[in-house]
Every structure is written in structure tokens, then in C-alpha cells.
């Protein structure tokens, strides 16, 4: 993009991506992250492997953030200078919406699906701003309700072309008509700096990958206590309070490895449709989630409910037998159908009447340790609605709360010993062009002060077996706990 084109675009938009494409057929996304982001706070790495196997076309490296929206004492709080015109306190969700609206910029033809926006997580407990589910006064982690990076610089690796697109977003923070030429020069200077960083050598010696082992861990709320809660939920279901409730338990294990090393192991051992590494101020988030919360692209919304689980078989024959058993299980089918209906209802609140449909129903998707029943529901976003509206209509996922959602969440709030924090919320982005892509925050580790926190849940219905549901939580957490333990021993 030359200066004259930049000047024309600057007349009617506050964000302009200035780009430079380079050949990158010898680099990996992890190597790009090392070179460009250098594991700094305020950076991220997003990747995807469809069905846990083939790698998707794009990987995204967040190199620099202009500011960070978070929450402190229940109020929106900015680290760095926010754009003029957006709230600097009050409801953090309102601040997020206002930021996206203020910086809205049409998508440029020929660009990757994501070129900049607000990237990070919404914790499960932010639903208390959307639904009356209880105060959630017990909060042992004290994690911000949300942390969203206002991404200015990023690199997009195109695996099909063997190229990397460097993007320096010129953001008009002050919403003024002056300083256009200076903004262009600044963006070009940042591109030059990123290109220089790409040319430098970064030591990454081969690391011996030790055998995967389940580490020693502590369950915050497991075993007999969790099983007793399952019986309590079953009584409530029989009394007609809910159809399904999804309680969870948190596991803790020591983590001496870097967040990047945990991510490296997790992407190698448990590739999933949503893989992410975030370095925030004071903590890190690493995950490999199989399940989208909701995706909005070009005015169309998609949810991807996952419910029904079996462990992977030791042989192809056993694996197929377990898949057949899963699809034939009346409890698993009923639970899955309930959550498909919930997804249809969520989209129906923000999509055009008659546009919501189930386009894929009850397929089996396999991952490293478990397999799931999955479906896909789509709809056309109604006029006057935005990706933010779609996200809040679907939040949190029914697969992490239950049905009906409000009552299920109230029961969870009564029974679980602490706020969930990140678990059961979402991770992803709301971009400047009005699209979004978010994953449910499962199969995810919160890394802070030498400890990894991993949480997992189980869907409880009237005939659930408490012991089996307790074990299901442990099975779901195993891949991430193993990855942390393996990363701790890399090269040793």
C-alpha cells in the first residue's frame, strides 16, 4: 500500500492495515512467534488443525498490542491508551462492544480472515452481567472477567503459499483527521522492524520429547464430593428444575515450563481446531479446544455443539467399536440432541427467522485421548445485529452449562466451590471488520506463579452414573495435564 492509497482510506476509517508479504517456507508458526513476539506479554499465537489432523491454511502471530482491555474490581480497566471515544470504566462488556464499534473497518479484498481486532478471552463468570445466576462470591483465582488485546501488529502465515503477511495496523486513536502521513510512516517503520526480526537467528535446540505421563495433581473438588454433587443434580433434574447440568472440577499441577513449551507439547500431542497461546500481564493461557462457541463470518453464524464422549481405543477395531457404542448410547444421543436444540434456540435469538438449520448432525470426531459426537448449526445474522450480539446470545455454551441455561447456571453456582474463571468461557477474537471466531475455553491451562490450572466438566442427566461422570472429567483434563508434565521435562 502506498501513501496515496493510505490517505484515501484514512478519510473514512480509523484502522488501516499496512502489509508486506514475505516468503516463509522455512519457518514454522512457533519459530515466527519466537522471532517476532519473543514471548512478550501482550502477544499470542493462534493455530488450527481440522478434526485434530490436517493443519488449516492460516496461523496468526500477535506481535504487538496497542492496549489491553481487562477488568479490575468489576470495572473496565485499560492497560495502555485506549482509543478516544470508548469507555475507560464501567461494564467491561460495554467497553468491548464500544471499542469494536468505534474501530469498525470494512474487510479488504484478498486479505486473510483476521487482520486485527480484540483478541483474548471472556471468562465464564462474565455471564453474571447477562443473566441472574447468583453472586459467585467464592473466587480463589481472582482472574479478570475478561482480557482482550487491541492487536496492532501481527503476522499471518499462509501454509498453502509458504508465505507470511506482516500487518501493521495504523489505528487512529484520537479520531482526528491530522497526522495521516505520520501514521503511515509509523506503520511502515513497524513493518521494517518485524522484517528485521524475521531475519535474525533464534536458537531452538532440539528437545528430547519424554514419554507422556499423567503427573501428580490435586483436584479442587473431585472424588466423593463431586459424586455427591452429581446425585444432588440428579434429584433436581427429577424434580423438574433442569434437563441437564454440567458441573466441573479443577485440577492443579506444578508448572516449571514456559507457556511456549507447554503449547509446543500440546499442539504436538493434542492438535485441535482451536489452539492458542496467550501471554497476558501476570498469567498465561494455553489451550487446544475442540469446540467452537460461535463463529460469525460475512453475516452468517455457526455453532458446533459437542456432547457425548468416549476414550480412544487401543486399536482401530476397538476405536470403531467405541464410536459405534457412543452413537448407539441413548443417554449420549439424548444429551446431544438437547444441546443441538439449545444451539438452535441461541442462534434463533439473533438470526433471521427461518434461517437457522442443522447442517451436520451427530458425526464422530476423534482427538488424541477422546472422541465426541458433534453437530453444526448455522443461521443468517439478522439486520441490526452484530457479531458481539451473536456472541453474547450464545454465551456461555450449553455444553458447559446445561439446559435450560439460566437454571443450570444457578445450580452450578450453588454447588461448585469457586468461580470458574476462564473455564467454560471463550477464547478468540472480534475483528475490526465485524466478524468473530471464538472457541469454548476447554482443554485449556491457566499458567500462573508455577502452577497450571486445568478444569473439566461432565453433562449430568437423570440417569448419570456419578463415578463415570467423575472419571469423564479426569479423562478430559488428561491431555492438558500430560502436556504440562511433559513440558516440565523437555530436554531433561
Regions found by a protein language model. Give the residues of each.
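Extended alpha-helical targeting/anchoring segments
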Residues: 1-492
Amino acid at each position: 500500500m502506498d501513501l496515496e492509497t493510505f490517505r484515501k482510506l484514512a478519510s473514512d476509517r480509523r484502522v488501516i492495515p499496512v502489509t508486506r508479504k514475505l516468503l516463509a517456507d522455512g519457518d514454522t508458526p512457533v519459530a515466527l512467534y519466537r522471532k517476532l513476539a519473543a514471548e512478550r506479554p501482550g502477544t499470542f499465537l493462534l493455530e488450527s488443525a481440522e478434526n485434530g489432523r490436517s493443519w488449516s491454511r492460516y496461523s496468526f502471530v500477535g506481535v504487538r498490542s496497542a492496549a489491553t482491555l481487562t477488568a479490575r474490581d468489576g470495572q473496565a480497566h485499560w492497560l495502555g491508551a485506549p482509543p478516544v471515544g470508548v469507555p475507560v470504566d464501567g461494564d467491561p462488556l460495554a467497553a468491548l462492544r464500544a471499542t469494536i464499534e468505534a474501530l469498525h473497518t470494512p474487510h479488504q479484498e484478498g486479505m486473510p480472515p483476521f487482520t486485527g481486532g480484540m483478541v483474548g478471552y471472556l471468562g465464564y463468570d462474565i455471564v453474571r452481567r447477562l443473566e441472574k445466576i447468583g453472586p459467585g462470591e467464592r473466587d480463589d483465582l481472582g482472574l479478570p472477567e475478561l482480557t482482550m488485546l487491541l492487536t496492532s501488529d501481527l503476522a499471518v502465515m499462509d501454509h498453502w503459499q509458504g508465505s507470511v503477511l506482516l500487518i501493521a495496523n495504523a489505528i487512529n486513536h484520537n479520531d482526528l483527521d491530522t497526522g495521516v502521513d505520520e501514521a503511515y510512516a509509523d506503520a511502515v517503520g513497524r513493518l521494517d522492524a518485524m522484517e528485521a526480526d524475521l531475519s535474525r537467528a533464534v536458537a531452538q535446540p532440539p528437545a528430547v520429547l519424554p514419554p507422556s505421563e499423567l503427573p501428580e495433581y490435586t483436584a479442587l473438588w473431585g472424588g466423593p464430593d463431586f459424586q455427591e454433587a452429581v446425585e444432588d443434580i440428579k434429584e433436581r433434574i427429577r424434580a423438574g428444575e433442569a434437563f441437564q447440568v454440567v458441573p466441573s472440577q479443577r485440577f492443579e499441577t506444578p508448572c516449571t515450563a514456559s507457556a511456549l513449551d507447554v503449547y509446543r507439547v500440546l499442539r504436538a500431542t493434542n492438535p485441535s481446531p482451536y489452539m492458542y497461546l496467550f501471554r497476558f500481564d501476570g498469567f498465561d493461557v494455553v489451550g487446544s479446544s475442540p469446540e467452537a462457541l460461535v463463529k460469525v463470518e460475512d453475516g452468517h453464524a455457526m455453532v458446533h455443539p459437542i456432547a457425548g464422549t468416549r476414550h480412544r481405543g487401543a486399536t482401530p477395531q476397538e476405536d470403531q467399536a467405541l464410536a459405534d457404542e457412543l452413537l448407539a448410547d441413548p443417554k449420549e444421543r439424548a444429551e446431544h440432541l438437547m444441546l443441538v436444540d439449545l444451539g438452535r434456540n441461541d442462534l434463533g435469538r439473533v438470526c433471521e427467522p427461518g434461517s437457522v438449520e442443522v447442517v451436520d448432525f451427530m458425526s464422530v470426531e476423534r482427538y488424541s485421548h477422546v472422541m465426541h459426537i458433534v453437530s453444526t448449526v448455522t443461521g443468517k445474522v439478522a439486520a441490526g445485529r452484530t457479531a458481539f450480539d451473536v456472541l453474547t446470545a450464545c454465551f456461555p455454551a450449553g455444553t458447559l452449562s446445561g439446559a435450560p441455561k439460566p437454571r443450570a447456571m444457578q445450580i452450578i453456582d450453588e454447588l461448585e466451590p469457586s468461580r470458574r474463571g476462564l473455564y467454560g468461557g471463550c477464547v478468540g477474537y472480534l475483528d475490526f471488520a465485524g466478524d468473530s471466531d471464538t472457541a469454548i475455553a476447554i482443554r485449556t491451562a491457566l499458567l500462573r506463579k508455577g502452577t497450571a490450572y486445568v478444569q473439566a466438566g461432565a453433562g449430568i442427566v437423570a440417569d448419570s452414573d456419578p463415578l463415570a461422570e467423575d472419571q469423564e472429567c479426569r479423562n478430559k483434563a488428561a491431555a492438558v495435564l500430560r502436556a504440562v508434565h511433559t513440558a516440565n521435562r523437555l530436554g531433561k
